[in-house]
Swiss-Prot record:
This is Glycine cleavage system H-like protein gcvH5, mitochondrial. It is found in: Mitochondrion. The keyword Transit peptide applies. Pfam families: GCV_H (PF01597). The keyword Mitochondrion applies. InterPro entries: Biotin_lipoyl (IPR000089), GCV_H (IPR002930), GCV_H/Fam206 (IPR033753), Single_hybrid_motif (IPR011053). Residues 1-23 form a transit peptide. Keywords: Mitochondrion, Transit peptide. Residues 50-136 form the Lipoyl-binding domain. One of its GO terms (cellular component) is glycine cleavage complex. Coiled coil: none annotated. Signal peptide: none annotated. Disulfide bonds: none annotated.
Length: 163
């Protein structure tokens, strides 16, 4: 009995830390906590999902190109609905890059202050310290339509070969 309780507690603890990450063709990643999505398996799109958005290491920023400035949209009032896509602007030494969220009708809810203070985290640590922002959305199908890690890796490999 004690072992069973310990196993259930361990399973519960591990499930709280499980994240699902999906990738877009424009090299953005979105990660959601598994529990965040637990009520959405019935295709009910009214539940709010919180996701972390970032740029992958295969993104449009050259590893040797310093990010000078990042511009996020204004975080709007909770009740405001924005039909415009979420767009983040990255200024580098050589270019300005516009990143459009692959999730439709998402809302910016917080910005990674560390990335504003140290923009090169996007290059040096894109999947951990270099995350960009937190978004909320309600349609899990938008998230599920993105690529998983294997699909994304194959996409990147095939894209490099075609060039």
């Amino acid at each position: 009995m004690f072992l069973f309780k310990t196993t259930n507690n361990l399973r519960k603890s591990l499930s709280n830390k499980f994240f699902c990450t999906r990738y877009s063709k424009n090299h953005l990643w979105i990660s959601i906590n598994n529990n965040n999505n637990s009520n959405n398996n019935n295709n009910n799109n009214n539940n709010i999902i919180i996701g972390t958005l970032g740029l992958t290491e295969n993104g449009p920023i050259n590893k040797f190109d310093d990010v000078l400035y990042i511009k996020f949209p204004i975080i709007k009032d909770e009740n405001q609905v924005d039909d415009e896509p979420l767009t983040i602007s990255l200024d580098t030494i050589s270019d300005q890059i516009l990143l459009n969220s692959p999730i439709r009708n998402c809302k910016l809810i917080s910005i990674n202050q560390d990335v504003l203070d140290y923009p090169n985290y996007i290059n040096s640590s894109p999947m951990s310290k270099g995350w960009l922002c937190k978004i909320k959305f309600s349609n899990i199908n938008d998230f599920n339509s993105l690529m998983n890690k294997n699909e994304y890796d194959n996409y990147c490999k095939n894209k490099i070969i075609k060039i």
